[in-house]
Amino acid sequence: MRKNRIQTILCIVLSIALIATLALGMNKSKKEKEKIVASKKQYESSINQTSKPEEEAKESNVEVENQGSEEKFILEGKTLLSLGDGVSKGSSYQEKVKNLLNLKSVINNSNNGLVMSSMINLINEEALKDIDIIMIMVGTNDYTKGRALGTINDGGEVESFYGDIQEVINAAKKAKPEAKLVFLTPLKHGYIEGQPSYPDKNNIELGLDDYSKAIKAVCDKNSIPVIDLFNESGIEAENIAQYTVDNMNLNEAGNEKVAKTISESLQKIYK
C-alpha cells in the first residue's frame, strides 16, 4: 500500500512538472511571436521613413525643374526695342546685336538730345505691344545739361536723375510687365565744343561716372539688369578716337565693340 502511495505521489509530481514545462513553452512561444511582430512593425516603419524623404526630394526636384523652365528666357527670335539719345540713333550696334543673337527684329527709337526724363514719352502700351526686350542707354545729355542727381530714395515724382530712372522703370513695368528691361550705362566720350566732356565735371560738379553709378544703383534697387558700357565696353579716354567719328558717335569699329559687349552680356543675363 505504501508502494502505491509513492507511485501516486510520483505521478502527481511528474504531471505538475509536465504542465509547468508546457506552460513555460507556451509563454516563451508567445513572447517570441510578440518579438517577431514588433520587429516587423519596426522594419515597416523604417521603410516608410526612408521612402518619404526620397519622395519629397523627387517632388522638390520636379518643382525646381518646373520653376527653372518657367524662368528661362530664350533670346533667339525675340524683338528688341532700343531707346537712347543721339549716340544710339546714329549707330548700327543694334543691328549687329540682332545678328549676333539671332533676334527676330530690332526697333531703334532713339533721338538726339534725349534725357532720362524724356524716356517716359517713348514708353507706353502701344509702343511696347510687340516688344520682348527694352534696352535703354541714356545719361550723356543729363550729364552735359547738369541734371540734379538727387538721392537713391527719390521716387518717380521727384525732379532728379535718380527719380527719372525710377519713373522710367515704373512706366515700363506698367506698360508691359512681361517685357525684359535692360539699362546700359553711357559710353565715355572725348572733347565736344561747348559742353563738358569725360572726365571733366559738369556745371554742378558731377562727372559722367556719377550718372553711370546712379543708373546702376536704381536698377539694383529694382532688380533690373545693367550692361555697364561705361566701365566694360573697352572704350576709354585714350582710345576714343579709334572708336568714334567725332569723339562721341561710334564708327564701325566702335559699333562692333559695343555690339559684342551687349550681346555677351545679354547671353550671361538670360543664360
PLM region spans:
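Catalytic His-Asp segment of secreted/periplasmic serine-dependent ester chemistry enzymes
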Residues: 188-271
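Conserved SGNH/GDSL esterase-like catalytic core that processes O-acyl groups on lipids
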Residues: 73-83, 87-164
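N-terminal secretory targeting modules
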Residues: 1-83, 88, 99, 267-271
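A short helix->loop->beta-strand "cap" motif at the edges of active sites that frequently abuts
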Residues: 103, 175-180
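Generic structural signal for well-ordered alpha-helices
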Residues: 165-169, 212
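A generic structural signal for well-ordered alpha-helical segments
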Residues: 98, 172, 218-219
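Alpha/beta-hydrolase-fold catalytic nucleophile elbow
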Residues: 137, 184-185
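Glycine-rich phosphate-binding loop signature in dinucleotide/nucleotide-binding domains
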Residues: 127-130, 175-176, 269
